[in-house]
């Protein structure tokens, strides 16, 4: 599948030491496996794979080099699992504040369209690519950092925050706004219909329909915030 190759998606088997055994067989030292975050040490001193039993999403830097990984349990296993997603720990080569998921695959499209869509998760990015919208990156649920904004600003000054239409999505759209403004970015906000995230919405619509929805519903940040404050005050001018 093209999208699997494009994002270098993988799967770590349900054997919780498969990578450990294969890596050590090939001569990789215990310290290296721990330091890179691929494995962790148990109390008894044995090693366990960090991402066992998960779909793997590699984090690529702007040059396409792998810096770290995200791992997600499959839907059938999410019940009772405390962490649906796990990520590589910070290391000498992976600093989450400086990276954006999908930036390598998106950079040429961002320049071409002079705009970037910011979403929350890995699957949001991938679903939008499948829908034909490629100028999209994710900050994976963390607050935007100055480093991430400056990275985006190398390619465009225009950003649309694209999030779920529920309360959590509204809060997410407000995070990092001040920093975006301080870095001179032009901001628009688009909240999807309640109950949809970019992943589910992209699965229901083709690229043309999705782009038309964005065009019809994205709002300038000032207008978006004013409307939000009006709703919160229930149109009471005193509030």
What do the PLM-derived regions correspond to, one by one?
Residues 15-155, 159, 173:
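Phosphate-handling DNA/RNA-contact segment within nucleic-acid enzymes
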Residues 100, 146-149, 153, 169-177, ...:
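Amphipathic alpha-helical transducer elements in NTP-driven molecular machines
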Residues 3-6, 13:
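Terminal amphipathic helices with adjacent charged low-complexity linkers/tails
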Residues 122-123, 133, 184, 190-192:
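Alpha-helical interaction elements
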Residues 185-239:
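C-terminal or mid-to-C-terminal helical accessory/interaction module adjacent to the motor/catalytic core
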Residues 132-136, 176-179, 204-208:
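Short secondary-structure boundary/capping segments
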Residues 123, 144, 163-173, 191, ...:
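Acidic, metal-coordinating catalytic cores used for nucleic-acid/nucleotide bond scission
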